[in-house]
Amino acid sequence: MPRKIRQLIADLESAGFAQVPGGKGSHRKFRHPRRPGAVLLSGPAGDDAHHYQEKQVRHAVREVQP
């Protein structure tokens, strides 16, 4: 069963990512001080996440963990 967008947001925030301005509509942009670039999530918080979004978040969280 796919995870919800809100669960991916919680994973990013617990890893130290912060939401920054720049997303339009249901797009949200997250940055981390130790990681270059941004992670972009699209879709309402209650929607199911696509597999590529889950993979993107999982990879970003692994990059910043010590």
Where are these regions (language model features)?
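Basic nucleic-acid-binding interfaces
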Residues: 1-22, 30-66
